[in-house]
Amino acid sequence: MGLLDAGFSRDNVLVAPVDAVLNWARLSSLWPMGFGLACCAIEMMATNASNYDLERFGIFPRSSPRQSDLMIVAGTVSMKMAERVVRLYEQMPEPRYVLSMGSCSNCGGPYWEHGYHVLKGVDRVIPVDVYVPGCPPRPEALIGGLMKVQELIRMEQIGMSRQEALKKLAETGVEPRPFIERERSSAGA
Protein backbone atom coordinates (compact mmCIF):
# COMPACT_ATOMS: atom_id res chain seq x y z
CA MET A 1 0.00 0.00 0.00
CA GLY A 2 1.37 3.35 -1.00
CA LEU A 3 0.60 6.82 0.19
CA LEU A 4 -2.05 7.35 -2.46
CA ASP A 5 -3.76 4.06 -1.61
CA ALA A 6 -3.99 5.01 2.05
CA GLY A 7 -5.46 8.42 1.24
CA PHE A 8 -4.73 11.66 2.96
CA SER A 9 -6.05 11.28 6.45
CA ARG A 10 -5.21 13.43 9.44
CA ASP A 11 -2.18 11.23 10.14
CA ASN A 12 -0.54 12.29 6.88
CA VAL A 13 -0.81 16.03 7.42
CA LEU A 14 1.98 18.04 8.95
CA VAL A 15 0.97 21.33 10.50
CA ALA A 16 3.74 23.85 11.09
CA PRO A 17 4.22 27.59 10.90
CA VAL A 18 5.50 28.90 7.59
CA ASP A 19 8.52 30.36 9.40
CA ALA A 20 9.51 26.93 10.67
CA VAL A 21 9.23 25.29 7.25
CA LEU A 22 11.17 28.03 5.46
CA ASN A 23 13.86 28.15 8.15
CA TRP A 24 14.19 24.35 8.11
CA ALA A 25 14.74 24.44 4.35
CA ARG A 26 17.30 27.26 4.61
CA LEU A 27 19.29 25.80 7.50
CA SER A 28 19.31 22.36 5.90
CA SER A 29 20.94 23.70 2.74
CA LEU A 30 23.61 26.21 3.69
CA TRP A 31 25.84 27.09 0.76
CA PRO A 32 28.98 28.76 2.11
CA MET A 33 31.47 30.64 0.01
CA GLY A 34 34.91 30.24 1.48
CA PHE A 35 37.04 33.35 1.45
CA GLY A 36 40.36 31.87 2.55
CA LEU A 37 43.11 34.43 2.99
CA ALA A 38 45.76 32.84 5.19
CA CYS A 39 46.48 29.79 7.34
CA CYS A 40 42.84 29.55 8.49
CA ALA A 41 41.98 28.64 4.91
CA ILE A 42 43.89 25.36 5.32
CA GLU A 43 41.66 24.42 8.25
CA MET A 44 38.59 25.48 6.28
CA MET A 45 39.65 23.23 3.40
CA ALA A 46 40.24 20.38 5.84
CA THR A 47 36.72 20.86 7.16
CA ASN A 48 35.36 20.54 3.62
CA ALA A 49 37.24 17.26 3.11
CA SER A 50 35.79 13.81 3.58
CA ASN A 51 37.03 13.36 7.15
CA TYR A 52 34.52 15.89 8.51
CA ASP A 53 31.82 15.50 5.81
CA LEU A 54 29.95 18.80 5.93
CA GLU A 55 27.40 17.45 3.48
CA ARG A 56 25.78 15.47 6.30
CA PHE A 57 24.65 18.83 7.68
CA GLY A 58 23.42 20.02 4.28
CA ILE A 59 26.42 22.33 3.82
CA PHE A 60 27.68 22.43 0.23
CA PRO A 61 30.61 24.77 -0.52
CA ARG A 62 30.09 27.09 -3.47
CA SER A 63 32.62 29.15 -5.37
CA SER A 64 30.33 31.94 -6.52
CA PRO A 65 28.89 34.64 -4.25
CA ARG A 66 25.69 34.64 -6.29
CA GLN A 67 25.03 31.03 -5.26
CA SER A 68 26.03 31.43 -1.61
CA ASP A 69 24.12 32.43 1.48
CA LEU A 70 27.06 32.24 3.90
CA MET A 71 30.49 33.84 3.61
CA ILE A 72 33.29 32.32 5.65
CA VAL A 73 36.09 34.87 6.03
CA ALA A 74 39.13 32.86 7.08
CA GLY A 75 42.39 34.64 7.71
CA THR A 76 44.09 38.00 7.62
CA VAL A 77 42.13 40.71 5.83
CA SER A 78 44.43 43.42 4.49
CA MET A 79 43.21 46.92 3.72
CA LYS A 80 43.37 46.23 -0.01
CA MET A 81 41.47 42.97 0.36
CA ALA A 82 38.72 44.64 2.41
CA GLU A 83 37.28 46.22 -0.74
CA ARG A 84 36.96 42.78 -2.35
CA VAL A 85 35.34 41.34 0.77
CA VAL A 86 32.70 44.07 0.65
CA ARG A 87 32.15 43.60 -3.08
CA LEU A 88 31.65 39.85 -2.70
CA TYR A 89 29.35 40.38 0.27
CA GLU A 90 27.19 42.76 -1.75
CA GLN A 91 26.94 40.20 -4.57
CA MET A 92 25.43 37.58 -2.26
CA PRO A 93 21.63 37.26 -2.31
CA GLU A 94 19.55 37.96 0.80
CA PRO A 95 19.35 36.48 3.37
CA ARG A 96 23.10 36.30 3.77
CA TYR A 97 25.27 35.45 6.73
CA VAL A 98 28.93 35.96 7.59
CA LEU A 99 31.14 33.72 9.71
CA SER A 100 34.48 35.17 10.78
CA MET A 101 37.04 32.40 11.27
CA GLY A 102 40.25 32.90 13.21
CA SER A 103 41.88 35.61 15.26
CA CYS A 104 43.05 37.61 12.24
CA SER A 105 39.60 38.04 10.73
CA ASN A 106 38.00 38.49 14.16
CA CYS A 107 40.26 41.25 15.51
CA GLY A 108 43.46 41.53 13.47
CA GLY A 109 45.28 38.71 15.25
CA PRO A 110 49.00 39.12 15.90
CA TYR A 111 49.04 42.08 13.49
CA TRP A 112 46.71 44.09 15.72
CA GLU A 113 49.22 46.48 17.19
CA HIS A 114 51.89 47.00 14.54
CA GLY A 115 50.20 45.92 11.32
CA TYR A 116 49.19 49.11 9.55
CA HIS A 117 48.15 47.07 6.50
CA VAL A 118 45.74 44.74 8.34
CA LEU A 119 42.07 45.37 8.98
CA LYS A 120 41.41 45.14 12.72
CA GLY A 121 38.47 42.79 12.27
CA VAL A 122 36.30 42.06 9.26
CA ASP A 123 33.29 43.37 11.19
CA ARG A 124 34.54 46.88 10.45
CA VAL A 125 33.49 46.51 6.81
CA ILE A 126 30.68 43.90 6.79
CA PRO A 127 28.29 42.66 9.49
CA VAL A 128 29.45 39.41 11.10
CA ASP A 129 26.97 36.93 12.55
CA VAL A 130 29.24 34.29 14.11
CA TYR A 131 32.85 34.48 15.29
CA VAL A 132 35.02 31.36 15.50
CA PRO A 133 38.08 32.02 17.70
CA GLY A 134 41.46 30.38 17.32
CA CYS A 135 44.75 30.72 15.53
CA PRO A 136 43.90 28.81 13.41
CA PRO A 137 40.68 27.26 14.70
CA ARG A 138 40.34 23.52 14.36
CA PRO A 139 37.79 22.06 11.93
CA GLU A 140 35.60 21.07 14.88
CA ALA A 141 35.40 24.73 15.92
CA LEU A 142 34.38 25.73 12.39
CA ILE A 143 31.70 23.04 12.41
CA GLY A 144 30.50 24.43 15.73
CA GLY A 145 30.33 27.90 14.17
CA LEU A 146 28.35 26.55 11.23
CA MET A 147 25.95 24.92 13.67
CA LYS A 148 25.60 28.31 15.37
CA VAL A 149 24.64 29.85 12.00
CA GLN A 150 22.05 27.11 11.57
CA GLU A 151 20.64 27.90 15.02
CA LEU A 152 20.50 31.58 14.07
CA ILE A 153 18.50 30.69 10.96
CA ARG A 154 16.20 28.46 13.02
CA MET A 155 15.40 31.39 15.36
CA GLU A 156 14.49 33.84 12.59
CA GLN A 157 10.93 34.79 11.84
CA ILE A 158 9.39 36.54 8.88
CA GLY A 159 9.75 40.26 9.47
CA MET A 160 12.40 39.82 12.20
CA SER A 161 15.64 41.70 11.80
CA ARG A 162 19.00 39.96 12.08
CA GLN A 163 19.78 41.78 15.33
CA GLU A 164 16.53 40.54 16.88
CA ALA A 165 17.36 36.97 15.82
CA LEU A 166 20.86 37.25 17.31
CA LYS A 167 19.38 38.56 20.56
CA LYS A 168 16.84 35.73 20.64
CA LEU A 169 19.60 33.18 20.03
CA ALA A 170 21.70 34.63 22.85
CA GLU A 171 18.73 34.42 25.22
CA THR A 172 18.23 30.71 24.52
CA GLY A 173 21.84 29.95 25.44
CA VAL A 174 22.36 27.53 22.54
CA GLU A 175 26.06 26.69 22.39
CA PRO A 176 27.85 24.38 19.93
CA ARG A 177 30.44 23.31 22.55
CA PRO A 178 28.84 19.94 23.44
CA PHE A 179 29.06 18.98 19.77
CA ILE A 180 32.73 19.94 19.64
CA GLU A 181 33.54 17.96 22.78
CA ARG A 182 31.68 14.91 21.47
CA GLU A 183 33.62 15.03 18.19
CA ARG A 184 36.97 15.27 19.97
CA SER A 185 36.21 12.41 22.34
CA SER A 186 35.04 10.12 19.53
CA ALA A 187 38.07 11.02 17.38
CA GLY A 188 40.49 10.07 20.15
CA ALA A 189 38.79 6.75 20.90
UniProtKB/Swiss-Prot annotation:
It is an enzyme of class 7 (translocase). The keyword tRNA processing does not apply. Its EC number is 7.1.1.-. GO terms for molecular function: 4 iron, 4 sulfur cluster binding; iron ion binding; NADH dehydrogenase (ubiquinone) activity; NADH:ubiquinone reductase (non-electrogenic) activity; quinone binding. Its cofactor is [4Fe-4S] cluster. Binds 1 [4Fe-4S] cluster. Its main location: membrane. Belongs to the complex I 20 kDa subunit family. NDH-1 shuttles electrons from NADH, via FMN and iron-sulfur (Fe-S) centers, to quinones in the respiratory chain. The immediate electron acceptor for the enzyme in this species is believed to be a menaquinone. Couples the redox reaction to proton translocation (for every two electrons transferred, four hydrogen ions are translocated across the cytoplasmic membrane), and thus conserves the redox energy in a proton gradient. This is NADH-quinone oxidoreductase subunit B. The lineage of its organism: Bacteria, Pseudomonadati, Chlorobiota, Chlorobiia, Chlorobiales. The gene is nuoB.
